[in-house]
């Protein structure tokens, strides 16, 4: 148990039997009336985002989330198989749980897998990964005064917008949070 005064970004709460991660919080002390805490919460399993307001000092139940560094091994149908780097145990994580991270997962890549009571909740990747471009059209600058971009398919099958000078076979750095091109690797 914790109070709303102890909230931090990333903390996982157990509200009404569901797990919610604190995305953002703000302590508000109006000139008139009692203080309160305004939060933005994200459902860990469904991804639904809600705004919730608590009175200051209200007790909330925190959930114990175990974060472990694991290595991605392979895809098994809809599941993704990860191996714990300390115990070498393998766990299957549902594709829905992996979510957008699947676009940047390569075999043997390390990721952080968060679990609650042995159930995988979500997968966190490093903020950037290096991927090889498997296909992109040749870029023709033409008579444009500004630089343009073009779609490129990377080795995981995801599509990334890259500058016109990038060619097939090059390795690029991609931001895993939003899929942006960061530069050549």
From Swiss-Prot:
One of its GO terms (molecular function) is translation elongation factor activity. It comes from the Bacteria. NCBIfam families: efp, PRK00529.1. One of its GO terms (cellular component) is cytoplasm. It comes from Salinispora tropica (strain ATCC BAA-916 / DSM 44818 / JCM 13857 / NBRC 105044 / CNB-440). This is Elongation factor P. GO terms for biological process: peptide biosynthetic process. InterPro entries: Elong-fact-P_C, NA-bd_OB-fold, Rib_uL2_dom2, Transl_elong_fac_P/YeiP, Transl_elong_KOW-like, Transl_elong_P/YeiP_cen, Transl_elong_P/YeiP_CS, Transl_elongation_fac_P. The keyword Membrane does not apply. Pfam families: EFP, EFP_N, Elong-fact-P_C. Belongs to the elongation factor P family. Involved in peptide bond synthesis. Stimulates efficient translation and peptide-bond synthesis on native or reconstituted 70S ribosomes in vitro. Probably functions indirectly by altering the affinity of the ribosome for aminoacyl-tRNA, thus increasing their reactivity as acceptors for peptidyl transferase. Pathway: Protein biosynthesis; polypeptide chain elongation. HAMAP family: EF_P. It is found in: Cytoplasm. PANTHER family: ELONGATION FACTOR P, ELONGATION FACTOR P (EF-P) FAMILY PROTEIN.
